[in-house]
Amino acid sequence: MIFKKTILIFIISFFFISISFASSSSSSSSSSSSSSSSWSSSESSSSPAPSKYIYAIAVIENYKQQQFLIIDPWENNTILSESLQLNFEIDDILIVEESNTFIVYSESTNQSLISINPNTLQSKLINKITPPIAGFEDMLQPSVFISEKKVLYKPVVDINGGGELSSLLRLDFESGKGTFVNISNENQISTAGSIPNVAYDQLNDYVFACYNSSNNNVLVAFNETTSDIIETYGILKNIQGFDVTMMFTDKLGNLFLVYQDNSGDVFVCEVDSILMECFGVFKYNIGTVPYAFSPYFLSRDKSSLVFITYIDENQFLLEVVDFNHGFKSKKTIFSNSYLNNPFNVYWVSLTY
């Protein structure tokens, strides 16, 4: 099982926010072929890069130092690097609001929702869960934060009662209450210690969960407001034997799963809930991953997948793949020179 590490941790969120700067302009990119039945690979564009920054918080030496970074990967430049003087540990960057205020999650002060002003670097507690929820192991799968409800879903392993069942922890920061959501049923019990995945369909107010049961991927949907199970779709037949690593919905509510094989290929497939199959729409090779972070995650606006892949000890390749427009992509190479040791980096937050 994968749990939080307390070595050099790099909590990083790639919030590609529309921040204007003079040297860039928006443009179209060349398309890659895609269909619902065949894999597509990304194709780069020669047009100018979008005007977007990387926002990151580097946590060094067991939280002795937390560093705030703004990086422009398209110009290969560090815009800002400031030390944060905080009395809590940041475990996840959830969103960056239009005002550029950070909303972060911390478990060092119960389960807390906190805002950080990027100009003053001052923090403010929004709310915390009282009493704190205990009896779980925090998993490094992507969380889902529903900002308009102030609700956070975290994939966890529930160790209450001596078991190790994968579950979802629902943290409601409006009410200050936290609950476990049981995503398995009596016929398909989740494999002990397996890592669940979660996605939110804002259009229909559904939460989708996917978990492993006896080497099968089981899909479940429930109502976010009531937590009532809407449907247990059952086993996705054509991806048996693969571990799903991420799931997401697009703006129309279509559900996508991400999984990878041992050769470094990452597959994105769209779920057909009638046929109970997941049809391949995109493939990306991440190659060898000599570092301890996930090289892909979802954009904040649900428009793109972002891939960070290793080139050499001094450089990373950033590629933004727009799945709402035929999987067109933008790519650039940026330096990791702002890190002390990139091979000791761990990315906890994979929001965007």
Swiss-Prot record:
Top-level division of the source organism's lineage: Eukaryota
Record keywords, A-Z: Glycoprotein, Secreted, Signal
GO cellular component, one term: extracellular region
Residue stretches of biased makeup (Low complexity): 25-47
Subcellular localization, as worded in the UniProt entry: Secreted
Protein name: Uncharacterized protein DDB_G0289171
Species name: Dictyostelium discoideum
Signal peptide: 1-22
